[in-house]
């Protein structure tokens, strides 16, 4: 257990950040699955709508630092590529 005030504060901060990051990561996984499901059904409109939501969430996660910027770009690129194949 931590002995100093600053160490106790860091523990509290880490717990808060971990919870927030977990929630954001879970949301991203769900949105990725929605995009994949829309692509699977070959519904281009639904896929585009799901992609817009997913893209926005990924950008926000990267901006805050939950995921690295390159990973965000990779996620968006793969999703866009899958949607482009629907045509």
Curated annotation (Swiss-Prot):
The residue stretches assigned to a coiled coil in this entry are: none
The family assignment reads: Belongs to the bacterial ribosomal protein bS20 family.
Entry keyword set: Ribonucleoprotein, Ribosomal protein, RNA-binding, rRNA-binding
Kindly give the InterPro entries that the UniProt entry links to this protein.
Ribosomal_bS20, Ribosomal_bS20_sf
The UniProt entry's GO CC annotations, sorted and at most eight, read: small ribosomal subunit
Q: Which GO terms describe its biological process?
A: translation
Annotated region described as Disordered, given as residue ranges = 1-26
Compositionally biased residues, Low complexity: 13-23
Its biological purpose:
Binds directly to 16S ribosomal RNA.
Q: What name does UniProt use for this protein?
A: Small ribosomal subunit protein bS20
What's the short name of a Pfam family annotated to this entry? Ribosomal_S20p
Question: What superkingdom heads the lineage?
Answer: Bacteria
GO MF annotations, alphabetized: small ribosomal subunit rRNA binding; structural constituent of ribosome
Gene3D superfamilies associated with the record: Ribosomal protein S20
């Amino acid at each position: 257990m931590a002995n100093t005030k600053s160490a106790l504060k860091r523990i509290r901060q880490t717990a808060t950040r971990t919870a927030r990051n977990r929630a954001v990561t879970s949301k991203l996984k769900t949105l990725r699955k929605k995009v994949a499901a829309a692509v699977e059904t070959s519904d281009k409109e639904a896929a585009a709508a799901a992609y817009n939501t997913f893209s926005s969430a990924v950008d926000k996660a990267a901006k805050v630092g939950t995921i690295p910027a390159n990973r965000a770009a990779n996620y968006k690129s793969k999703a866009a590529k899958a949607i482009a194949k629907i045509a």
